[in-house]
Amino acid sequence: MRIPLIAGNWKMYKTVGEATTLVRDLLAGLGELSDREAIVCPPFTALAAVAALVADSPLGLGAQNLYPEAQGAFTGEVSPPMLVDIGCRYVIIGHSERRQYFGESDAFVNRKLRAALAHGLRPIVCVGESKPQRDAGQAEPIVTAQVRAALLEVPPDQMANVVIAYEPIWAIGTGDTATPADAQAMHAAIRATLAELYGSEIAATVRIQYGGSVKPDNIDELMAQPDIDGALVGGASLQAASFLRIIHYQ
């Protein structure tokens, strides 16, 4: 059984004070989570403060990025062991904003994913197509190629720790959302690709999230789709009321 994962990606928002206020509000309304997981991914500067608040709570902690070396002269970067040490269990890998603004290639995303796994972190690896690619009918081959590249040399026994997030680039922060049917079709294509790579039994265990303008008013229909196993939430995770409604989808 795939346990749904709702993850809040706070991007470059929230000071330490703002982050702790938000987490306290989330914890106050969270309750017990018996059939789903929820995590927040604050900016690096707030990780320690948030880690202290969520310890021994149902709310988990993730990071938004890492550098694929354990240590070294890499000014400005953060390593997998540093994230583990601070209390992270998850890390977002290859978000479209990293690919677009910082030139991260499929090969570099693969390095990051394997580094995360090697240090006991669970990567949330992001894939998705642009609007021109979708309009040209290339969405599925683009996305499945990203999946194959991200998972290069990842052994079958590690796939239980991998989460894939399908985020159509044209839907991120725009208010546009893929229809539940379109999202389901892409999730099914991703799962079929996983079956080609690892067999249907392993493919059936991998969680595939949807991301891209996830909101309280569309989460229920998205989560009703058979291959959608959670959500990677941006703007709607920055307010307690909206994120709690998403976490408590019906």
UniProtKB/Swiss-Prot annotation:
Cell membrane as UniProt keyword: no
Keywords assigned: Cytoplasm, Gluconeogenesis, Glycolysis, Isomerase
InterPro entries registered for this protein in UniProt: Aldolase_TIM, TIM_sf, TrioseP_Isoase_bac/euk, Triosephosphate_isomerase, Triosephosphate_isomerase_AS
Domain of life of the organism encoding this protein: Bacteria
Pathway noted in the entry: Carbohydrate biosynthesis; gluconeogenesis; Carbohydrate degradation; glycolysis; D-glyceraldehyde 3-phosphate from glycerone phosphate: step 1/1
Subcellular localization: Cytoplasm
Residue positions of the active site: H95 (electrophile), E167 (proton acceptor)
Coiled coil: none
Gene Ontology biological-process annotations: gluconeogenesis; glyceraldehyde-3-phosphate biosynthetic process; glycerol catabolic process; glycolytic process
SUPFAM superfamilies the record matches: Triosephosphate isomerase (TIM)
UniProt-recorded name of the protein: Triosephosphate isomerase
Lineage start: Bacteria, Bacillati, Chloroflexota, Chloroflexia, Chloroflexales
Gene transcribed to yield this protein: tpiA
